[in-house]
């Protein structure tokens, strides 16, 4: 059905247009700012539906999770862990930190020992991760990690960060990942956590390693696209700001309650 446009309607539309043009001409900057602000608010609502803004941390945080943490490496340089642990905003505090320990065959993060010690001393739960290099034999990488990290009771299980395949097929990558996981589990007595991005997971790892806990990176989503993955941790942003840390830092949530977090740390299997 087509609407008939009368002369009166045409006149009204013309007057409205002239009025808008006059406002823009008289207040150009204010008009642009108004429309920009409105557009930003609409965009924020679309992108962050299910999130809530937390001003001090400079990001939106998923609203339905209560346990928050960060992950750090040499890129954050020297961290003031006392300030990190004291930070609070709107009932949100940081309860855990994943810390890069090693990478590939030889690389040990230069800040690992300091971060590992001070995060625990300031009351945060801590976990150590190894960045997996597909070009290096898995046993070599596992030994480097185990020689570097001194686990204590109350620490998270070891974490394997798998983000690249290199020249390997997906099948060969999974074989090497499995070798690392089994070696580290045998040594530590706990099943390691596997970290990966959502896209890489779907392409290379989906349907495998279901017996292991997962930590998935997927930004600006209401929930991570997990394709049936039983994820424990979700890295939802890489732009957080935290007292005591220079620059941006990754933010994560734990998928569970305080009791489930403690059971996870203790290595207690939940009753189905």
UniProtKB/Swiss-Prot annotation:
Family according to the record: Belongs to the glycosyl hydrolase 25 family.
Top-level taxon of origin: Bacteria
Residues annotated as the enzyme's active site: 163
GO biological process: carbohydrate catabolic process; cell wall macromolecule catabolic process; peptidoglycan catabolic process
UniProt lineage: Bacteria, Pseudomonadati, Pseudomonadota, Gammaproteobacteria, Enterobacterales
GO molecular function annotations of the record: lysozyme activity
Organism annotation: Escherichia coli O157:H7
Record carries keyword Nucleotide-binding: no
Keywords attached to this entry: Glycosidase, Hydrolase
Protein name: Uncharacterized protein YegX
Pfam family membership, one: Glyco_hydro_25
Xref: SUPFAM superfamilies: (Trans)glycosidases (SSF51445)
Chain's gene name: yegX
